């Protein structure tokens, strides 16, 4: 709440004749106020304004602006629109002036009204530099120095912030961000793309929902043609957080004053927050070294005497003091409106950073004994995750699949390969049987089953499965290796030597286990070349095949052996061999479909994981390598420190928001 003349008049009518100046030496006017009125106003101020301002100031002091946008007012306008003059009038200090681009870096102007102090204080800070200022006349020089340091001494601009803090009895409680004036064409030493760069910088600020756009427009131009208002409308089409400020009313052409009044009364280009009109120091007044306090007095007289604009003064829409009051009121309202969203953002950021910090773990201890315990914890966590993988109990996200589930899919594919291999087309199998009958039957009489034919076909069909089994071994091995590597990344990512060592162990053990697994798979298929099955098991399987054939014959769905009708004895021999093949296939497929996955699981999951766990524990035996293994990536420590600082800021911010009376 800015102490306006209206407020003072209500508190003490006798004081109404003494204007309260926001800039320059206002002490004389302040001393003339009655003590009762002053106490009353201070009480109102403390109750309504200070809690909101102090909350945001405290969050800003914590550095929360590094994490989240806080409510503020951004001042934008076309070049030479009078932005600097408005800011000077509000802050009471002279800011850089001149031709071309004067504001080359975003200037955060933090104004804090002192209630019980008379001393003026200022501070300029940028990058790692900070300087206290005790004389308002030094501000312009320090701002120019800051801009030259950040953006160079040419005409370029920078996104880097300069912060000017002013504490005084004569300023309103506001946070303003002064942005470079919009230019369309590069002139002189300006970069060719200066216009684009400035617009990009401005949009970065005004698109934030937490920012009120204060659009400065000269009164003597067509408001519809101003770039600044167009940019504000682009990011705030409803005009919910845009305020229009008309400047230079003394330069309005005669006969057009009523159009200016219509603009201020929101009848031309509608903004929900409306418009204000102010008259700041002109160029001649600046050259004549007119003080800011005197300029405010002249402004008041100008509007009081103006035949068109005096009504705007009576409506509270004219003069810098009224503007200051409106801006403070708007900022307070905006703060209160933004607090629920800000609270949610802080809570969500706090949770996100907490989770991110957990990935970086705690700092590596300096003490050697502590390093050993630290490394033990790291390796134990890794080994526990490997155990979870082996047992099929690892934690996965909603969209992820457990390793064992993926392995089961591969084993299911293997059973399909076996089934497809054994279930050849009956005509193809019949031709194969006839070939072996003609090739190997010898002197046996027709109708007798040739065991050599049966055995040869069985061996060939089983042999055909050997390479697919080895391929499955390689596929599963890659899946397990990648899963183990992911566990290493999860646990050791920030310790590149430890992660690299774990990857080396993973690869070495993989190669060894894969060789052993392949050796046993090939041994199994060598054993499968011995055609064997328990007698009672085989008899049972053969009986089932024959019963099934008999049932199908009854239903007139017997196998088609029409191509081999040379004799009933040949038919009988063919069918007999076919039945034996089907019976043996059933039993052999049971063995192979289960035994090969068991071999792969044993070597490439169980033993692989256990050997890896032992190898990682062996790292603890060499104490001289602890420091090397626990060496972090160059930015890990800095990142952890950065996250801790952010977390501390957000924790304090949550606490202060919780304590805010609301």
Swiss-Prot record:
Residues annotated to bind GTP: 77-84, 178-182, 247-250
Keywords: Acetylation, Antiviral defense, Cytoplasm, Endoplasmic reticulum, GTP-binding, Immunity, Innate immunity, Membrane, Nucleotide-binding, Ubl conjugation
Region (G1 motif): 77-84
Transmembrane segments: none
Modified residues (N-acetylmethionine): 1
Annotated region described as Middle domain, given as residue ranges: 366-533
Record-linked Pfam families: Dynamin_M, Dynamin_N, GED
Role noted for this protein: Interferon-induced dynamin-like GTPase with antiviral activity.
Protein name stated in the entry: Interferon-induced GTP-binding protein Mx1
Gene designation: MX1
